Amino acid sequence: MVDYTDIKILNLLKENSRVQWKDIGKEIHMTGQAVANRIRKLEAEGIIRAYTILLDEMKLGKSHLAFITIFMKTNEHSRFLDFIVTKDSVVEAHKISGEGCYILKVFLESQEQLNNLLNEILIFGNYRLNLSVNKVKG
């Protein structure tokens, strides 16, 4: 069971997963060891699954962010899933309900790369493209 203190710890870790336990403890009025015990419990329960980094794709030269909704031609999805795993530009892929089968979040360096990816996707089905013009949260 997660309590209010656990939520505060999780929120601090979401801001910076490299923060030291003693610094979290100062923030929430606990010892570093008590924070460590709570974090280990959250890890053991699978609530904390991994510690990772967030990249600024724009600073890496990938200035085109697009969301692509995929409408599969057939129900043979395994080839498509194998395909997207090989694409570094696909940073997220979700199977969705409603309109479409999948939605992809892609970062690309150029319009040409986007066109090439879209042409490859046509092998599997049609798509709807949405380009991000401004990030408002996250």
Residue ranges and their predicted role:
Residues 1-138:
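A compositional/biophysical signature of low hydrophobicity enriched in polar/charged and small residues
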